[in-house]
Amino acid sequence: MTTKPQNSKQGLAEGEMDVSSLFKRTEVIGRGKFGVVYKGYNVKTGRVYAIKVLNLDSDSDEVEDVQREIQFLASLKQISNITRYYGSYLKDTSLWIIMEHCAGGSLRSLLRPGKIDEKYIGVIMRELLVALKCIHKDNVIHRDIKAANVLITNEGNVKLCDFGVAAQVNQTSLRRQTMAGTPYWMAPEVIMEGVYYDTKVDIWSLGITTYEIATGNPPYCDVEALRAMQLIIKSKPPRLEDRSYSTSLKEFIALCLDEDPKERLSADDLLKSKFIRAHKATPTSILKELISRYLLFRDKNKNKYKIEGSIPENEPSKPSEAPKPSQNGGGDEAQKSIASNDNEIKRVNEGDVEMKWDFDSLSSSDYIIENNINLDALAEDNNEWATAQHDLFNYAYPDEDSYYFDPTSHNTRPFVYQGTTIGKGYPGTIAQNSTLNAPVTNNYTNSKYPSKMVAGTTNTSGTHTAGPMTSSKRLESKAPKQLLELFEDNEIITAENDVNTEAPKISKSISSLNAGNSSRDDFIPSISNEVNGNINNNKMRPHLPPLSSGNNYYSQSTPALPLLQTKFNKTSKGPPTSGLTTAPTSIEIEIPEELPNSALPTPASADPVLIPSTKARSSTVTAGTPSSSSSIQYKSPSNVPRRLTVSNNRPEHCPSTITNQKLGSAVASNSGISSTPNNSNNYNNNTDSENSRGSSGSNTANSTQMGITNPGNVTKLSTHKASSPSRPLFGVGTSPNRKPAGSPTQNIGHNSTHTNLAPPPTMKPMANSKDNKDILLQPLNSIPSSSTLNTISGNSSNNLTSSNYFSNEKEGSRVNGDFKRNNPNLKLQMPLPTPVVRNKLLDPNTATSQNNNGMPGSAGISTNENINQFGFNTSSASNIPVSMTPISEKHIDFGGKIKRSQSISNRKNSSASEHPLNILGSSVSGNVSGIGNNNVGSNNNSGPNNSVPLSANTGNTTIKANSTTIATSSSAAASTTAPISQQTIPSGTQFNHILSSAATAANSVNSLGFGMCPPPQSLQMEMFLDLESFLPGKQRRVDRKPQVLKELENLLQMFEEGLPCIEHALKEQLISTPIKDNEH
């Protein structure tokens, strides 16, 4: 029996005929976007059809959609795997569209019994790709591919239906710009305004449909459509992560869900993918098993939910008068119902309701027998899909009825009926969507945060908390939301505000649109990590569960800037992804909005071994403990300009225990050698009152005070707030020839085995071990003996030299792997911004009054031992807002030519890569050779200063070196002194000769014109305030960031231009002196 197909024009032309005399409707099998879908038959032939009756009394836009659908169906009727169109008829204000009837039902319905095997997914995707290949050749975009629009016939054939929003791409412009489709299946380019798209959007929707079939629901189905659209644009594409899925299926979804439409494969290419080829030979008849499984599931759960083919009782299109299917395909019963059905058409709800094709008229026993289905091959109902489903509301399918809670009768909660307020009077009522028993596991949080928030009519929110926190690996447990919340009197729980009571969320300003305008207040200091232990800060995939409840999605297109952890003496609490963003690369340093002040000194700890004293600068923003590490790789935001980084943290440095000697700040204090016989070992040089520059916008001033006295080899460590960001250079496993990548415009990559995940390393002191005894690493003012320097070299417990360097001729130049490991603490200090009030320590006159001759290094004056190269008295610097900060590691190349650093305008970090002569990135900042630069206020071209007698009482020799101030010059002159590696020094040279050489080097530096610029005397403190008073009593916000950046650049430029002279001085001072084994 065949029927003459009629296209749209013919159908409309023949509309004068009474269509009811040609086709009879028997029952309602679903409701579409604009009308009701009936099951009917042709009166003459008895062939069954699907009759879509549309009401044309709606808006003109909807009429155009109907006409478009008819047009596409007429043009695509010869394509396989697409619901065939037979014609359309106009009756009064109703349009009858005659279509192929797919008795099997929608794929969405077949998913109800539970998870389906991948063999079925492969066949379904293969058939859909064949359909898409054909329509894409005709430049037609379906734009609404989802499981509900995929029909399965009784024979197992796959049909793609519902072309209501399909679009024809014309030949002149092969791309579209209008938004259409269902939000949860939309491609990012469809959602973004002003972005053109093509047929590749169907490939994205196909990938989401595959994800839906595999997991039960599309991504973001637990949030509203508008929020889901934002997440689709800003988040990374969904991926299947569970181990139960095959690699080929994961790959197929990844190929479909490519962010770049150009890289997204076409339907023809996807047919050649591994997943499709694996199921190439599987026949479509295997899908009959899915139909049989559903029919058995339906019979088993008849009493727990309504049959899908019937319309809910509260809806206007109640099919009470629709006839039941008859054995003769129609008959008198169908004839009697025509009038009532016509009235029903006029009462159709015009709401946007999902198409729900019916196959419940089939008998399970008859179907299984007729098709010879092997019941043993059918997968049993997967009960785990139903567990914990009751706490999720599916916004992707909001109009699906609440059929059941789980396949068993263990249901203790009342039903919620969609479209009514029945059951909503109880605080424990859950908005239920159980069309899909998606596999989830309960996500519990600790008692601080509710795991469920339920909106009830009593203006209260019921909460439920459970025991220890666990996490699911598949789907997320979100705070449910009732469909009719907008009509409730209580406060609406939205996806944005329901999470604020639970855990801090990533700032909304950190997005792909305005990441550069992020406010410092948007970041949470790490102290909140101990309170909010379950902040999920690394959501890479939208379908993975959060560690805290609530719909706390956020964008992943711009990585979250890391939070700052300040308490490293306590183990970080919370899950492995709490609060800290671990990054294997250096992070740019943000300018603090307030000037960090060092806190008052605190009593020294009785047991310094238990206190981790310092940590690398980059650890302040990337530090993570093994318990809080993650596998996320930090990706710097593309639109955030990278600032100069003063640290180049290496991940391979390990923490070391604190012993009883001075931290290896080398000659960090600008103090001379006193020849006073009763010179004691007590010293407090280089009080590292270092304020870490607030990174990531944090205003926390991380300061550490390390006042170390050594009267009896007892080390005391005073810490406050956080550890100092001093750079511990333990060169374990490192090479001195390795140049760190110090470009401020790019991140510094490390090996995959090295990450900044370890706790911040502890500063390693100069212990009694034989590997840290270089004479230049010992403070010159703290000789641990009151005798001469000659006797020091014979002291077996405090050796100042090591034969490891000088006993071997091959290691005479010190350019070897041991130098970095044995000289970890060379560093340079530089001042941070100072307050408006002029500090007395910065005044050269005040500093001069503290000394006999106005210069540090005077013999016999103990107060001069604490004046560093910037004129700061470090003994009292702990109470003033003056900080020192170390520089990064440097490459060693003593034999190379001295290079001049590039201009600051090219954003090159000369401290990391431009100066090959700098030792490990740390220069000897102490005034070893008596270089006096205490005249802070002097100009750059200042002449020779007062004579500085550097007295080194060695028993028979006194050396006086006439030193001058090093003035900064615009270009560094080339050195005329031979490199250290070319200098030969007799083996009997003692320490006094080295000091003499150092003093000579200082004079040679001055003769070459090197100089250092004095530090700034004062800074305008108002640049740290974002408010200014423009009228009495009124203030306005002003952007001070450019001014602060300018001041920082000036400081860095001063620091850069002072490096050549320091390098030159180091080159002259670091002399290899061979010493016999029996002389040390």
From Swiss-Prot:
SMART domains: S_TKc
EC number: 2.7.11.1
GO molecular function: ATP binding; protein kinase activity; protein serine kinase activity; protein serine/threonine kinase activity
Catalytic activities: L-seryl-[protein] + ATP = O-phospho-L-seryl-[protein] + ADP + H(+); L-threonyl-[protein] + ATP = O-phospho-L-threonyl-[protein] + ADP + H(+)
Ranges annotated as biased composition (Basic and acidic residues): 808-821
Enzyme class, first EC level, given as a word: transferase
Any GO BP: intracellular signal transduction
Region Disordered, annotated ranges: 308-347, 615-760, 787-831, 901-956
Polar residues biased stretches: 615-626, 656-673, 693-726, 743-756, 901-913
Domain Protein kinase positions: 23-276
Chain positions recorded as ATP binding sites: I29, G30, R31, G32, K33, F34, G35, V36, V37, K52
Modified positions (Phosphoserine) in chain numbering: S735
GO CC aspect terms: cellular bud; cytoplasm; incipient cellular bud site; mating projection tip
Biased amino acid composition, Low complexity: 312-326, 627-638, 674-689, 787-807, 918-956
Keyword Ribosomal protein in annotation: no
Active site, per annotation: D144
Keywords, comma-separated and alphabetical: ATP-binding, Kinase, Nucleotide-binding, Phosphoprotein, Serine/threonine-protein kinase, Transferase
Other facts: Present with 1040 molecules/cell in log phase SD medium.
Role this protein plays: Protein kinase involved in morphogenesis and cell integrity.
Subunit structure: Interacts with CDC31.
Family statement drawn from the similarity comment of this UniProt entry: Belongs to the protein kinase superfamily. Ser/Thr protein kinase family.
Protein's name according to its UniProt entry: Serine/threonine-protein kinase KIC1
Species this protein is from: Saccharomyces cerevisiae (strain ATCC 204508 / S288c) (Baker's yeast)
